[in-house]
Amino acid sequence: MLLPDLHPYTILLSIFLVLVAKQLVATIGKSTIQEFVWLVYLKVSSNQSIKTYNSKQHELHETNRQKRAISAQDEYAKWTKLNRQADKLSAELQKLNQEIQQQKSSIDKASNALILVLTTLPIWIARVFYRKTHLFYIRQGIFPKYVEWVLALPFLPNGAVGLTIWMFAVNSVVSNFSFLVSFPFAKRVSKPVRDTKVE
């Protein structure tokens, strides 16, 4: 076997944590997580183009403030010089913005790949390598035979519970819990109004 022979409770707990993480990602949203990762990258990065962009943006703001403070008719030469400087800064900012957007795109791809590796890959690995592992047993006679048979699907003897049923149960519980927690914060839906017929 390629993977180590894990204790059933280790598999139970690992799959539970992965499914909770997957539900958290679904509830929060990948785009929100990617935006958070990008903001963290902006804070900790020593990337020169980001620093240059911020300084040029501040410089453009100052130039525009000075330009608004003077009259174009009274001080035409100074206003024209400031206007040219603002146009030059805007062009530089646009170029830097394109570079930063490319960096953001690569950071988004990397964070998306990390989310995929952390939430989907472990589930597929477990499904392939631990599908025949008995996670726990149910006392005989608690459920009818057909329920025991369903719980043992797809590869286990009656009375055993495997990974497929465990994942189904955990997904159901976690998604229902997530709904109960997020429901009070959901956008309120207005009460429908009946169309009245005009005679």
UniProtKB/Swiss-Prot annotation:
Q: What's its membrane topology? A: Multi-pass membrane protein
Domain of life (superkingdom): Eukaryota
**TM ranges:** 12-31, 116-136, 161-177
The terms under GO molecular function for this entry are: protein-membrane adaptor activity
Q: Where in the cell is it found?
A: Endoplasmic reticulum membrane; Golgi apparatus membrane
Q: Does the keyword Transport apply?
A: yes
**What's one GO-annotated cellular component?**
GET complex
Give ranges for the Lumenal compartment. 1-11, 137-160
Pfam families to which the protein is assigned, alphabetical: CHD5
Outline which residue ranges sit on the Cytoplasmic face: 32-115, 178-199
The record's Gene Ontology biological-process terms are: tail-anchored membrane protein insertion into ER membrane; vesicle-mediated transport
Assembly and interactions? Component of the Golgi to ER traffic (GET) complex, which is composed of GET1, GET2 and GET3. Within the complex, GET1 and GET2 form a heterotetramer which is stabilized by phosphatidylinositol binding and which binds to the GET3 homodimer.
Protein task: Required for the post-translational delivery of tail-anchored (TA) proteins to the endoplasmic reticulum. Together with GET2, acts as a membrane receptor for soluble GET3, which recognizes and selectively binds the transmembrane domain of TA proteins in the cytosol. The GET complex cooperates with the HDEL receptor ERD2 to mediate the ATP-dependent retrieval of resident ER proteins that contain a C-terminal H-D-E-L retention signal from the Golgi to the ER.
Family of this protein: Belongs to the WRB/GET1 family.
Protein name per its UniProtKB record: Golgi to ER traffic protein 1
Q: Which organism is it from?
A: Candida albicans (strain SC5314 / ATCC MYA-2876)
Q: What is the lineage of its organism?
A: Eukaryota, Fungi, Dikarya, Ascomycota, Saccharomycotina
